[in-house]
Regions:
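FIC/Doc superfamily catalytic core
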Residues: 1-241
């Protein structure tokens, strides 16, 4: 009976394949990879956005401000420009949030000053007076090299969401910081750009909130492998014949 490869082994094999393709001088890397990812982020935002339950279907298309999508692209440009940074700290997190909030009514980069309940996860966020300490914990765990990179990346994503440091755009900030961390450690980012992710993403977060780290991690691994395979497919098409 053939043994099914571990998801982490598949990820490492895909990572090696991507690096080998990118090292090939005959590949038009400028036309793919980071540029394609930037385009897909707008699709991801539309898919993952959790509309208010009361909102009629016909109004949903107008609800998502296109400045939000533009800002997401600008935040991605910032990450690509600083993809080789040695340390991502709390200032970096606030900086990304500031970019996401440009031309909106959300105070960019400012920690919330009121209590928060994460209704979608069924948990209370920490007291706003604890925010500096909670975000220091996020930064500490991000730097803890005793923990494997992928585990740290997934923890960063969830911990920022669970802390709810800002008045809004916490999940977007968490995804971008996770991907920045992955890129700075030699991986490609994770995209949640399939229609099934609208429900599956929140199911995974709820599982993690209930202590089920296995289900959460399996979903994150699966999305990473899916993204890697899409990148490999597109990179191979970019070769000069």
């Amino acid at each position: 009976m053939t043994k099914t490869p571990k998801l982490t082994d598949v990820i490492e094999k895909n990572r090696q394949t991507i690096n080998e393709i990118l090292a090939d001088p005959s590949t038009h890397t400028r036309l793919i990879d980071m540029h394609w990812i930037r385009d897909e982020l707008s699709a991801e935002t539309k898919i993952l956005f959790q509309y208010p339950d009361y909102m009629p279907q016909k109004e949903k298309k107008m609800y998502l401000d296109f400045s939000n999508i533009k800002n997401l692209g600008l935040a991605w440009d910032h990450i690509v420009k600083h993809m080789n940074v040695k340390t991502i700290d709390n200032y970096s997190i606030r900086q990304i949030h500031t970019i996401l909030c440009k031309d909106t009514d959300i105070p960019g980069g400012q920690y919330r000053l009121s209590e928060a309940h994460i209704m979608q996860l069924g948990i209370n966020a920490p007291n706003y007076q604890e925010m500096l300490y909670r975000m220091d914990d996020v930064e500490y765990h991000m730097k803890d090299k005793r923990v494997p990179v992928l585990n740290r990346a997934f923890n960063i994503h969830y911990d920022i969401i669970a802390a709810q440091p800002f008045n809004d755009y916490n999940k977007r900030t968490a995804r971008l910081i996770m991907n920045w961390f992955l890129i700075s450690n030699g991986y490609r980012p994770i995209l949640f750009n399939k229609r099934t992710d609208h429900d599956d993403y929140m199911k995974a977060l709820r599982a993690r909130a209930n202590g089920d780290t296995k289900t959460y991690s399996h979903y994150m691994y699966s999305c990473m492998i899916r993204t890697q395979r899409e990148i490999i497919k597109r990179l191979r098409k970019s070769k000069v014949l």
